[in-house]
């Protein structure tokens, strides 16, 4: 049989299962928002705990919290950060648009843990009060966006940047010995002039290098924290200097260059910094979609496609066609890219709907951004491990397709003119003969002249 205790808020008393540490406002949220199962991301909960830890330290240093209260709050948060109370943060994303219930969830759990340590009994509001002590000098309106920024930075630095650097390393490693592999280029999915396989992959490498640069540029505004703006940006009930000292504490704890936002009205009412960052994630998804699709095309076959790359064979690909193997890692990555693009649409709409002094789409903004970061990170790591590491060029196929290409005729333009070169290409295509045979047949060049000019190795620089 379940045991319950009674907690209360301004709406009155409410029953809470005894084993949990949350209070009345968390329980009301559980009762009122039974909408799907997407919970607040763990890294956001961690960011909120870091926020409360730093706020309590500043409040103590400012003389606004007694030592006993501040210490008990700090110890409680350390236990949360150690993962001891993960099941005490059950709220879904689909709640109030300011994230108030999740902010109170954190306040209540911290106070409850602290009270248990001090009195032997969890819950309640004495001696540690969730609002008066844990939430002191704060509002959900500045705390939740601050946690959004902290979580975004931590997830990016811990997950996404390492994943992209890993992809960059393996693309560079794979292609470094491919400078002698001359293949036919393709534009409009039609044959074009030659290039090396290394040159082709250098485009992908640069896309990832630019992605990493874009992340660093977009993070500059995400480092700015709303804390200290309190309810509407004026800083009511927050001491002068709290915002600066708080940001310094967060920067010290996370080892990231957080600063207080210069204008708190903007940081509460708008989330342009996160919309911009989501745009960067969207651009990364665009880059990865292009890279993955190219590898998919170059690996098509095995006998009737381009077949210029051998992709690793990881699992059977068909329930009806024996022996079929598909580019499954490419398919997983490209599906992730479409999800990230869709997430950016959601973030864009949510970001554009900040009304007057507060944007109230905060949970859906951070949920989609953190999902995009996680999906990109995980899918890129999987793509590297199960695809990129095992890529190998099919030299024989590359040479065959290159030597058959009509577009090698381009190099003849300076010697016999565009129109005559076009006649050679059309003649070769019409009669199924080589360019050399067509050039000789049309009396434009001898075989010796043709061989001297049409040298793929001289067409790649």
Curated annotation (Swiss-Prot):
Entry-linked HAMAP family: FumaraseC (MF_00743)
Write out the coiled-coil annotation as residue ranges. none
Species the sequence originates in = Rickettsia prowazekii (strain Madrid E)
**CDD domains reported in the protein's UniProt record:** Fumarase_classII
List the active site: 188 (proton donor/acceptor), 318
Q: Which UniProt keywords apply?
A: Cytoplasm, Lyase, Tricarboxylic acid cycle
Is-annotated flag, keyword Lyase? yes
Leader sequence range is none
Pathway listed for it is: Carbohydrate metabolism; tricarboxylic acid cycle; (S)-malate from fumarate: step 1/1
Gene, per the UniProt record: fumC
In this UniProt entry, which residues are annotated as the site Important for catalytic activity?
331
What is the top EC class of this enzyme, as a single word? lyase
What catalytic reaction does the record list? (S)-malate = fumarate + H2O
Q: What is its EC number?
A: 4.2.1.2
Mention one GO molecular function: fumarate hydratase activity
List the protein's name.
Answer: Fumarate hydratase class II
Extract one GO BP annotation from the record.
malate metabolic process
GO CC, sorted alphabetically, is:
cytoplasm
General function of this protein: Involved in the TCA cycle. Catalyzes the stereospecific interconversion of fumarate to L-malate.
Task: Specify whether Lyase is a keyword of the entry.
Answer: yes
Family, as annotated: Belongs to the class-II fumarase/aspartase family. Fumarase subfamily.
> Where does this polypeptide localize?
Cytoplasm
Q: Which InterPro entries match?
A: Fum_hydII, Fumarase/histidase_N, Fumarase_C_C, Fumarate_lyase_CS, Fumarate_lyase_fam, Fumarate_lyase_N, L-Aspartase-like
Extra remark beyond the main annotation: There are 2 substrate-binding sites: the catalytic A site, and the non-catalytic B site that may play a role in the transfer of substrate or product between the active site and the solvent. Alternatively, the B site may bind allosteric effectors.
């Amino acid at each position: 049989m379940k045991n319950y205790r009674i907690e209360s808020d301004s709406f009155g008393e409410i029953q809470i299962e005894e084993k949990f540490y949350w209070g009345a406002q968390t329980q009301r949220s559980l009762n009122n928002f039974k909408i799907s199962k997407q919970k607040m991301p763990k890294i956001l909960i961690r960011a909120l705990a870091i926020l409360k830890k730093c706020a309590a330290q500043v409040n103590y240093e400012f003389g606004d919290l007694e030592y006993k209260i501040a210490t008990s709050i700090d110890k409680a948060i350390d236990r949360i950060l150690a993962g001891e109370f993960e099941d005490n943060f059950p709220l879904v994303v689909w709640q109030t648009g300011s994230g108030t219930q999740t902010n109170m969830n954190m306040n209540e759990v911290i106070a409850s843990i602290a009270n248990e340590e001090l009195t032997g009994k969890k819950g309640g509001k004495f001696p540690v009060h969730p609002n008066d002590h844990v939430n002191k000098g704060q509002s959900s309106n500045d705390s939740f966006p601050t946690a959004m920024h902290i979580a975004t930075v931590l997830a990016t630095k811990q997950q996404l940047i390492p994943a992209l650097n890993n992809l960059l390393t393996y693309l560079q490693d794979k292609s470094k010995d491919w400078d002698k592999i001359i293949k036919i280029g393709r534009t409009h999915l039609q044959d074009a002039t030659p290039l090396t396989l290394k040159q082709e992959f250098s485009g992908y490498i640069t896309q990832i290098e630019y992605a990493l640069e874009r992340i660093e540029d977009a993070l500059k505004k995400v480092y700015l924290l709303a804390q200290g703006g309190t309810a509407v940006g004026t800083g009511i009930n927050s001491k002068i200097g709290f915002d600066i000292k708080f940001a310094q504490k967060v920067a010290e704890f996370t080892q990231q260059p957080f600063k207080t936002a210069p204008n708190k009205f903007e940081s509460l009412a708008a989330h342009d910094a996160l919309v911009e960052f989501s745009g960067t994630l969207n651009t990364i998804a665009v880059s990865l979609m292009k890279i993955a699709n190219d590898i998919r095309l170059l690996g098509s076959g095995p006998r009737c496609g381009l077949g210029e790359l051998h992709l690793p064979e990881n699992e059977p690909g068909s329930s009806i066609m024996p022996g079929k193997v598909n580019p499954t890692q490419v398919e997983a990555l490209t599906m992730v890219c479409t999800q990230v693009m869709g997430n950016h649409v959601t973030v864009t709409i949510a970001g554009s709907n900040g009304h007057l002094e507060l944007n109230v789409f905060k949970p859906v903004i951070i949920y989609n951004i953190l999902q995009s970061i996680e999906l990109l990170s995980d899918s890129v790591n999987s793509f590297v491990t199960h695809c990129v590491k095992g890529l190998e060029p099919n030299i024989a196929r590359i040479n065959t397709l290159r030597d058959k290409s009509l577009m090698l005729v381009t190099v003849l333009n300076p010697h016999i003119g565009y129109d005559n070169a076009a006649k050679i290409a059309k003649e070769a295509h019409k009669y199924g003969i080589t360019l050399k045979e067509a050039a000789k047949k049309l009396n434009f060049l001898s075989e010796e002249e043709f061989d001297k000019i049409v040298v793929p190795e001289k067409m790649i620089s």
